[in-house]
Amino acid sequence: MKRLSVLVLLLAGVITSQAQSPVSSPVMHIPLKKVVNLQQEGDTWFPMLKNLHLPKPHPGADRALVASVKAELDTRYPLKENQSTSSAKINAAAPLVMRNFQGNAFNFYLPNDNDLAVSNGNVVSSVSNTMIFSKDLNTNSVYGSYTLHSLCASLGLAAEEFDPKITYDPENDRFIVVFLNGFTDSTNNVLVGFSQTNTSYGAYNFYSLPGDALNNGLWTDFPMCAVGEHDFFITGNLLYNDSSWQTGFNQSIIWQIRKDDGYQGNTLTAQVHSNVFYNGSPIRNLCPAKGGSGVYGPDMYFFSNRNFTTGTDSIFLVHLTDTIGSPNFAINVDAVIAPMYYHMPADVPQPNTVDKLIVNDARTMAAFKEGDKFQFVFASRDTATGNTGVYHGRIDISTGTPVMAANLYLPPTGSAAYPNISYAGINPGDEKVVINYLYGASTLYPGSAAIAWDNNG
């Protein structure tokens, strides 16, 4: 397997801390909305509206903001396709195809917003705009697809569903589904379903969290999720009505939910944390650091950065220290100084068209924690070639003073987009990961690829 070009490996042992005053709501009690059994209420006709682009208001404002930053960087760092600053490659054994399954078929919804979870019992479940699909790999049985449209209808909500996520809890052997509904403060809900069994295709206990979480005329967009030892965490961006996700941003929030309540179908015990700021500015797109080989707790960490930057070295690490109601609970916000700058990524050219694969921005796409070490990824522009690569950061907090290392990987040809990272270690202290990403170039149709990284780089 060919290895991506390694551009930089540096260490940074400097961290700056900033006292913050995040706000935690009083403990909330969210009643069970409904038990939904996917097998009993499956879709026969799979209704869908083709060529539907899920609405985000004022796309012109979106394009203007993003285009201005990218245009500046395009001029400063012009694209030089098929070039990299390093040609070093590491030989690895050819990958073996083992258990495999067909991916989600394109259903004409944009964006796809795919997410996937696999249980210890080999149950695979994927979600996308706008469907839930399950398969038992032990029996090779498909347990149908269930549209989020029908799920919203069964919950008495309008057909405005988007941004689905699915998480598997290996400690409790359960699945958790999250998706959003509605695009204004008066219609927006965060829907959370906890599976009653260890399958993803049975009954779920569904709850509706208010999208206007702070009751101040805002609505929730872009959820990210992680399960901890005691609690389930959902982050989201609060937006103003009739505004885009870029220009209408107010702040990011964190929902903290006692997960056992959801599994048992009881009233949820929950809190929402807000005012997660640094130097007076809200920290945007909080990405939970999931557990690597297993869940951790009672605390939870979150990553963020400056996703619209023309160039910076700030990485934000947010720490929720304990479970709901603990006297030791606190929210700490630190800015880690990265050893290398990152930049807003360039969009990816495609063959035979002037249209490009849009890469949005440099937000943290995924992160995990294994022991006292974190790994995370996002897209960043390479200033030497103008191409977009995968920024792979690592932070070690074992000494009490975070130490950060970072690499930027470029595909052999063209650019990368939308990276993700998964822990792949087996033994204690193992830092092996798999990083997957999309790629493309003016001479290369978009596709997907993956690399393996271990303690030796």
Segments predicted by a language model, with ranges:
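Bacterial Sec-dependent N-terminal signal peptides
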Residues: M1-P22
